[in-house]
Amino acid sequence: MGAKIQADEISSIIKERIDNFELNVDVNETGKIISYADGIAQVYGLKNVMAGEIVEFENGEKGLASNLEESSVGVVILGKGEGLREGTSCKRVGKLLETPVGEALVGRVVNALGEPIDGKGAIAATETRFVEEKAPGIMARKSVHEPLQTGIKAIDALVPIGRGQRELIIGDRQTGKTTVAIDTILNQKGENVICIYVAIGQKSSSIASVVRTLEESGAMDYTIVVNASAADSSALQFLAPYTGVTIGEYFRDNGKHALIIYDDLSKHAVAYREMSLILRRPPGREAYPGDVFYLHSRLLERAAKMSDERGAGSMTALPIIETQAGDVAAYIPTNVISITDGQIFLETNLFNSGIRPAINVGLSVSRVGGAAQIKATKQVAGTLKLSLAQYRELEAFAQFASDLDEATRRELELGQRMVEVLKQGVNKPLVIEKQIVIIYAGTKGYLNDIAVKDVVRFEAELHAFFEQKYSNILEAIKASQKIDDNTETQLKAALEEFKTVFNAN
């Protein structure tokens, strides 16, 4: 009897073991490299791989499945590609490309995969996000209505940028495009805006210089730099903007404000063209692939002003495009102009003639316009664009005319002084209330009897005078964001007083 009980126990134990048995077998779909060149591997055997999926090679290198062909897969290598050769095996990871996001990245320099490259140790990010995300839909957005002050008089007065807008900075090389972008970052100090600077295909020395400028100004406290330098592969240069925008979306979706700069998208398009041609995709105009428009539209559409239900956060994009000999009708410039909400044109001729920032006021527009300006700026800068346009027209005409009538001469003199007023030094953004004071002085005729060569000195001394003696006027403009009758009376009296002091000197 005892033996029978023992047999029952044994059989129940065996049954229990069978019921609870788990076969922990790691099943992976694997493949082998059949050819490898220029950072692209053709892999055979990954039958069920998804487009954009991560593929891991036996030496730890990772790649991105880009071309899904009948018999093989074109995999873009996300690294140096050392040790990869024909016959190297690889496996599917079953994940799409992700990047770390969050507050931990602020103040850091990362590569196109979100990995730190500044020598300050690992980043303790608590969250990751997919690099390729859909842009917010119409109902998730709100129209752009809050100003994003750049600190640059010519932009804030004439082509204002709003939070959630996409404003293109376009011009030839060495016209000050990056400087405009960096000054905008510097001006966000204390504005509770997280800035992301994405460098694509730049020299490492240039990036080091930008980071040094940001550190010296204390701007790295609210800035993240994403760098895919000229030494990096075309795949990493292609990915960098998407990594940057994903990092920015974290802040946008959490009710904060972000500013992202892509420097520059011309090199981004070139990197994508290089990648596409190696993948043997059919070339189109200027040898770019057919989806180069979508490359930039899906990136820039992710900048948005979110609705109140979604937290009312925003992400503003300032893409940069480099033109060749001022040709804004080339393929990539026209594409990006049509995607963005306006553009700031920088001209070589203006730059060389000492007008810096070299903004062509006639060609630069903001399609958001007055909605992105405070009332005080609208009050003082309303007529400025028109008078500058008239000045440019008269300037060309006046070169041939010997005797000018009084009205024309006055228009020319006002134009000359306003051009001087809009000049600004490198990395010297100006707070909006000071911009308003000097533009008010210019448009209301307080500069008419000041020599053109003295206008820059007049402005510098005016700001110092207001800081010392009439800071209450600056504070009133900043607080109310408009010039009421009382403020205007005080402003006029202060300007008269300053002119007396200035002329005496």
UniProtKB/Swiss-Prot annotation:
Keywords from the named record: ATP synthesis, ATP-binding, Cell inner membrane, Cell membrane, CF(1), Hydrogen ion transport, Ion transport, Membrane, Nucleotide-binding, Translocase, Transport
Superkingdom of origin: Bacteria
InterPro entries found in the cross-reference section: ATP_synth_asu-like_sf, ATP_synth_asu_C, ATP_synth_asu_C_sf, ATP_synth_F1_a_nt-bd_dom, ATP_synth_F1_asu, ATPase_a/bsu_AS, ATPase_F1/V1/A1_a/bsu_N, ATPase_F1/V1/A1_a/bsu_N_sf
Subcellular location: Cell inner membrane
Enzyme Commission (EC) number: 7.1.2.2
GO cellular component terms given for this protein: plasma membrane; proton-transporting ATP synthase complex
Enzyme class of the recorded protein, top EC level: translocase
Catalytic activity: ATP + H2O + 4 H(+)(in) = ADP + phosphate + 5 H(+)(out)
Membrane topology field: Peripheral membrane protein
Residues the entry annotates as binding ATP: 171-178
MF GO annotations: ADP binding; ATP binding; proton-transporting ATP synthase activity, rotational mechanism
Annotated site residues (Required for activity) in this chain: 364
The family this protein is said to belong to: Belongs to the ATPase alpha/beta chains family.
Annotated function: Produces ATP from ADP in the presence of a proton gradient across the membrane. The alpha chain is a regulatory subunit.
Binding partners and assembly: F-type ATPases have 2 components, CF(1) - the catalytic core - and CF(0) - the membrane proton channel. CF(1) has five subunits: alpha(3), beta(3), gamma(1), delta(1), epsilon(1). CF(0) has three main subunits: a(1), b(2) and c(9-12). The alpha and beta chains form an alternating ring which encloses part of the gamma chain. CF(1) is attached to CF(0) by a central stalk formed by the gamma and epsilon chains, while a peripheral stalk is formed by the delta and b chains.
Name the record gives this protein: ATP synthase subunit alpha
Originating organism: Aliarcobacter butzleri (strain RM4018)
